[in-house]
Amino acid sequence: KHMNNYFSLTIEEQQQVLRAVEGHIGLPVQAIEKDLWVTTILQIVFTLPFADKLIFKGGTSLSKVGKYISRFSEDIDLAVDRSLFGLEGDLTKKQIKKLRKASSVFVREDFFMALSDAIKKYGLATLCTIEPEQDGKGDNTYPEPRKIWITYKSVIQSELNYLKPVIMLEIGARSLVEPYTMNKVKSLVAENFPAIQTNVVDSEIATAVAGKTFLEKVFLLHELFSV
């Protein structure tokens, strides 16, 4: 691994990096740490074998950009292109039901396994745990969208009530194909400390045009804070 990679630093060094960024931009260290993890997981997701079928829809929270921190309330919202399940064109009610079940099972099985493997491959398996949303009962046997939670080991002792060290991915099939653009994403640590390598992989993120406004607000946020 690169010597200066954030993830191979000691806990004390990681704390120093996060505190330095906090001093620079005034956001709490917990938020800076979570931002780095959300960025990293998003980059890893777009290396998965079916990444060409995924679109990052953003996190709805940034519409409330006045409350900077609310960026973190919903972390990674992903749409899966229905062509992955062999469905095209206008769908009947029955096909939509089939699509939702297929998507739900895909997230619980294939997506979960592929993401677990990738987290191992990039050397982060000891730093976080990953768990899929379980099947529900009756009509909700196959939750759709289905969530996956990634809990990372925070290097900060104190926890903020409104900001847990958990990243929630919400993954669902969409019946509409949305316009998207390819973007790269940068964490607040990367923005403020270019000397520290934070990317485990610098992938291109297919971002829904609606989600792009989310990314733009994130970048606006970075500009506001990195003056």
Locate the predicted segments by residue.
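N-terminal regions immediately upstream of nucleotidyltransferase
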Residues: K1-T40, G86-Q95
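Short secondary-structure junctions and interdomain/linker hinges
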Residues: I25-P28, L48, A118, Y122
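Short secondary-structure boundary/capping segments within folded domains
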Residues: V29-Q30, I44-L48, I69-S70, S158-E159
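Short secondary-structure transition/capping motifs
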Residues: Q30, K34, Y68-I69, R100, ...
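Active-site nucleotide-donor binding segment shared across nucleotidyl transfer reactions
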Residues: F46-E88
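Catalytic palm subdomain of template-directed nucleic-acid polymerases
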Residues: V80-V105
